[in-house]
Amino acid sequence: MLSFDEALSRLLSGARQVNEIRSLPTLAAAGRVLAETQYATLSVPPLDNSAMDGYAVRVADLSTIGSCLPVTQRIPAGSIGTTLLPGSAARIFTGAPIPPGADAVVMQELCEHGEGGVVINHLPHAGENIRRAGSDVSAGSSILAVGQRLRPQDTALAASVGIARLPVFRRVRVAVFFTGDELRMPGAALPPGAIYNSNRFLLTALLEGLGCEVRDLGQVPDNLEATRAALREATHDNDLILTSGGVSVGEEDYVKPAVEAEGRLDMWRIAIKPGKPLAFGQVKVKMDPAGREVAFIGLPGNPVSSFVTFLMLVRPFILRMQGVQATAPLAYALRADFDWLHSDVRREFLRARLNANGGVELFENQGSGVLTSAVWAGGLVDNAPQQVIRRGDTVRFLPFSELLG
């Protein structure tokens, strides 16, 4: 068996990045992967401006609390005032540029109307309540790096410096199909021995959450020719083929021989629990003069095995195809509020969640077919091979918030 780290390394080295670039309106770019580093074309804020509603003043004019200054101008956001003369104040609002001559803003709560002006009940220091030009972003600075998945705050930052369109990589196109004559779709009758196809919903949603363009080829009969035909169809205009089920070594598992007939299989068994049977290879595109191949990953059929292997192996593979530079999930070192004394030669990913005491608790049944464990959990405990865990130990916790998307 391959170790988890070796399997992941091989997967990532075999991921071919999608280099086609699309130009999208910044408003539509969230969730996509940036194709070119972006630089600020202007400073933010472009001018010194007021951090709050109040009065712009000259500090030198305020020697005592209670000074009364005439208000000579009103400066709302979006307008520019004139030079503030000595011995006067300007009514100013949040975001409005500081008028020349002023060197502080006194918040309106510290002021009151007086006869002939405004009474300043505070002695400000120079620069008080002033946001300096370029304090957020300096013109010419790098604001967004190539290879990062754009979040709402990223597109907002781009918009703040006037970037109307962003270059992003084309979505990764993934064809999926599912094997197993026992599978039925929800809503259909369920004869004895049949089960509903939960993996179809699981994997489609996981792929869409990663921003993939999903082509669902549906259910494939459990025989070699049907599986080979599905593989050939899946190569058409796709970057990755993903299957669920049929990757074991049983007589009724046809994905492995089908991939070997239509291409090549590079690895097969991984020391991971759940999810030991996993196939990775390439499927040849028929009649392609360039000899193009499409990456293939076959996941195990058990729902939790499929879920965990997707998160820990397929997700970083797809991120690398998308051009994302950082593929490793953020992990937290937390206290175990459980005992796990069943050491295994494989690397284990245990369904767990945080409790109210700041520790991690474990779902009681860690079986690979127990989908309720993934629903109950808030993440995975990454447990090294042959490692037992005792209450109070520090464990490596991977929250689903880092893994889903």
Q: What is the predicted role of each segment?
A:
Residues 1-8, 22, 26, 48, ...:
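Generic structural signal for well-ordered, non-membrane alpha-helical segments
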Residues 4, 164-299, 303-309:
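Helix-rich terminal scaffold detector
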